[in-house]
Amino acid sequence: METDEQADYSLTHVHILSPAGSERMGKPMGHYITLESEKLKENDADCHEKLIGLLAEQIRSLAKPKREDCILVIGLGNWNITPDALGPKVISKILVTRHLSGTLPVEIEKAVRPVAAVSPGVMGITGIETGEIVKGIVDKLHPSLLIAIDALAARRSNRINAAIQMSDTGVAPGAGVGNRRMLLDEAHLGIPVIAIGVPTVVDAATLVNDTMDCILEEMIRQTEKGTAFYETLADLEQEEKYQMIAEILGPYTGNLFVTPKEVDAVVDRLANIIA
């Protein structure tokens, strides 16, 4: 793991290189990048320009297609629900160029990469599995790379709208809200897949878990080291604690997710940055 801490942002690279590491982390083997910045939530044009350049560098580090290779960008999510509309909003702001092939002067065409983009919607709108739509488009267009953009569910409340996560392992649409669909990855689509996501919601169990963490940290600080109570507090596993909270809250809150009240403006800013 490599972390670069700066005044306005932090950038973390995680490489999972072995099956043992994959099992321990609960993620497929691959390269994971997280760009965190509170400035993502704010209307700070100068900082956003810096973050756009940084984000572009990270995307290039995950895949290096040739200039003539076509890239397909997929905006996942339900455009009728603001926290889930990140993908479709990004697609609406992308400059698509695949249809311009052969119509531009040679000098300009050499500098323009063919890009196609689509928002396939969700199965509740189309009646079609998102993965089936994407697979059909890939089989027809034969792009060299797919970039999938999706809204995520945060596992830490301080990451809501403040982190852009990237990986070269693909994406499972709907997994964050317990509605896992067909995987969009190289094994299913036959081409490399870069996933880009932003946590825009958090579930009730995570909010309670984060609150308990703050309480436990304070209790540990005030408890004499070496006592049985101290050891009990220190030995609590994060994942076990989260699962216990989720099970307790389940009958009362159901599938409850929360998003900040300013989500409309923030999702628009995030879409501009990613696009």
Predicted regions span which residues?
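Proline-aspartate-enriched helix->loop->beta-strand connector
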Residues: 138, 143-144
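A structural-propensity feature for long, helix-poor, extended segments
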Residues: 108-138
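A structural signal for small-residue-enriched, beta-sheet-centric alpha/beta enzyme cores
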Residues: 118-119, 148-275
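Glycine-rich phosphate/diphosphate-binding loop of Rossmann-like nucleotide-binding domains
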Residues: 74, 78-113, 117
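Gly/Ser/Thr-rich loops at beta-strand to alpha-helix junctions
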Residues: 76-84, 124, 151-155
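Conserved active-site and cofactor/substrate-binding residues in soluble primary-metabolism enzymes
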Residues: 30, 46, 50, 54, ...
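N-terminal amphipathic/basic leader segments beginning at the initiator methionine
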Residues: 1-29
